[in-house]
Amino acid sequence: MNVLLTNDDGVYAEGIFILASYLVSAGHRVVVSAPDRERSATGHAITISYPLRAYKIKLNIKGEIDVYKIDGTPADCVKLGVEKLAGFKPDIIISGINDGPNLGYDVLYSGTVSAAIEGWMMGYTSIAVSLNSNGQYHFKTGADFIVRLLNNFDFLSLDQKMLLNINIPDLPGEKINGIKITKLGKSLYEDSFEKRFDPMGKPYYWLTGNNVDNNIHDSTDIWAIKNNYISITPLKIDLTDLSQIDILNHNLNNL
């Protein structure tokens, strides 16, 4: 398959390097178009106020692969990669492997997931893949799973393009309990800003906070990861709340 690969951790991150290596070794044609630095939690931002620059670089990966670092966001990397850099029409766009999970409401902040959404909006089946990092960094577990997924699921025959959010436990493959098809859970935080001072005595603020442990149902991505399952969540981007339309029509009749 022709694979466009991106991430939000940056082009030199371990997760994208290992995934690219596995994909090339499995016989896939891969082009990497990724940010030149850390771009986590940038959401679906795109660059419109200044030009983007792309630099072709080398990564120590055996086999044919073109790698570009972009001074833009993950969504920028997908747009530019598809339109100008790849040299082929992608069969699939993959974003990851992210260092850290993207579960529940966090997908709305995630540059990793937003890059996949951008690919889907452009008409391509797209996958975001993240590792629930706990210090072990089993990126190879995630890379092996993605290769097996591409080998066993015929994405090319689908009438509708898919948008998938995949989270992988940070474990050796043999310790994973299986695969769960899930829905998004509710990941909520108690946010706080810590006030600090720079060497000039001027204040700045650092966002901190704690995860609020909600009721976690066994159908959610959060439950699956907590119980050492691979979570696969099909996503859509229509945010319309259909249940509110009649209420609004009724109450705004005389406005």
From Swiss-Prot:
Localisation: Cytoplasm
Family designation: Belongs to the SurE nucleotidase family.
EC number(s) from the headed UniProt entry: 3.1.3.5
InterPro entries, sorted: SurE (IPR030048), SurE-like_Pase/nucleotidase (IPR002828), SurE-like_sf (IPR036523)
Naturally occurring in which organism (per UniProt): Halothermothrix orenii (strain H 168 / OCM 544 / DSM 9562)
Record NCBIfam families: PRK00346.1-4 (NF001490), PRK00346.2-2 (NF001492), surE (TIGR00087)
Name by which UniProt lists this protein: 5'-nucleotidase SurE
Annotated residues for binding of a divalent metal cation: 8-9, 40, 98
Gene name of the encoded protein: surE
Pfam families, per the entry: SurE
Top EC category: hydrolase
A single MF term (Gene Ontology): 3'-nucleotidase activity
